[in-house]
Structures are given as C-alpha cells and as structure tokens.
Amino acid sequence: MKTQEMLQKEEALERRIESYWDARSPKFSAVRRRELEGSDAARWQKFIASHLPEKKPLRVLDVGTGAGFFVVLLTRMGHEVTGIDMSAGMIDEAQKNLAAFGCRADLRKMNAQQLDFSDEFFDVVISRNLTWTLPDAMEAYREWHRVLRAGGMLLNFDSDYGETTFSAADARDSVHTGIGEALLIECNKIKDELRVSTHRRPLWDADLLEKLGFSVQYDADIASLVHGDESLRYDDVPLFGIYAKKVK
C-alpha cells in the first residue's frame, strides 16, 4: 500500500509529465499527421487488424491516445473508439485530427492509471508509446485488465527507454526534430524517476500481465512491420508489441 508521501510524490510527477506532453503536443501532432497521411498508416492498420477479434464493431479504448493516431485508424476500421490522455494539449490535437480526417470518437482527459469506466466495458485496450512514461505502469495494467471483458485483447506497443538518454543530436535526426534542450532535459529527468525505467521490457510486462490473468504473446521488435515510410526516421530503440488476451 502506498504511503501519503509516496502518493504526493507520484501526483507531483504526474503534473510534470502532463506539463511536458502539453508542451510537446503541437509538434508531436504534426508527426502523427504525417503518419496518417503517409504509407505507415496502412501498415499500422493491417498490423493491428491481424491481432483483433473478428467481431465488429469492437468497443476499443485507446489509452494515451496522444494526437489520436490509433483513434483515426480504428474508427476507419469501423470500431467504436474512446481515446483518453492526461494531456489536455494532446486531447485538443486529437480533436483537430479527428475533424481533419473526418472521424468521430469519444475523447476524454483521463489518467491511464485511474480509469472512469465500469468493469469489463471494453473488447480491446490499445496503447502506443505510453507505458514508458507512467509513474505506475503496474497500476495501469491492473486498470486495463479491469475494464476488459473476459476474452478481450490488450495490445501495447512501446519501447524500453530505461537506459536511453535522449539528446538534441538524436532529436535533430529523427521525426521529433525541434524539441528544445529544456524539454529534453526534463524528459530525461522524468524518465529516470520512473520505476518502469528500471525494468527490462517487454519481459517485465509479459510476466506481470500473466500474473494479472492474461495469456501473453509478444514480439521484441515490430518496427520493420509498421515503419516503412523513409521520410519518417524514428529512434533505434526496438519497438516491441504485446498481445495479451484476458483469460481470468
């Protein structure tokens, strides 16, 4: 059980994380729009579809939706999608992108670790590049398990950034060019305070999810399957994919 001091520290960290992503949201959204307008959107859509139940429409929760990339793809696929993010700036960007691409979905500002949904409400929970940013990834996984129906699927795409130090040089050479030095410093400081950064992933995630009641499969690196647009250069840290079915 968390002490009052631990809770206060976590809340302060959450505020820093929220402020960081608010500041990043406009340029981050520009990258996601480039993805949606380019060939990677079709790659992601095909890859996601291969791991979804055949039923349509599925009730899908996109956790840490950011600028709404997955929301756009999944609504195009005919599903009922709710996208949540702790950053108000990201939710604003997601709303703009949904409008730009002619999509409709339910977008809400919400903490990924404290979901305002009833038990077994969703068929699918999906997330991209979120869990490495969470103060308590374990609690988030518990919540995602709670809101999934029996037999539902959790798809998580993320990277193990624990031992990575983000630099201005790397940012200049990637899709995230233009991140200021102050934001990079804050990003590294936040990352180094997160417990998830001490774990080796996705092995840690798979072990935890199995204990929570999932049947788990994963790929150590799916980047070559979803990143093919040569105009978009990402970092070299492997992008893993976790596919977990709720069995109990």
What name fits each language-model region?
Residues 1-56, 69-73, 223:
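Conserved class I S-adenosyl-L-methionine
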Residues 32, 159-229:
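C-terminal alpha-helical "lid/dimerization" subdomain adjacent to the S-adenosyl-L-methionine
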Residues 61-63, 67-114:
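Class I SAM-dependent methyltransferase SAM/SAH-binding core
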Residues 113-124:
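A short acidic, Gly/Pro-enriched loop at the edge of an enzyme's catalytic core
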Residues 124-137:
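A short SAM/SAH-binding and catalytic strip from SAM-dependent methyltransferases
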Residues 138-150:
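A short glycine-rich, Lys/Arg-flanked "PGG" loop and its adjoining helix->strand segment in the class I
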Residues 152-159:
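Conserved beta-strand signature within the Rossmann-like core of class I S-adenosyl-L-methionine
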Residues 212, 229-248:
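Core SAM-dependent methyltransferase catalytic element
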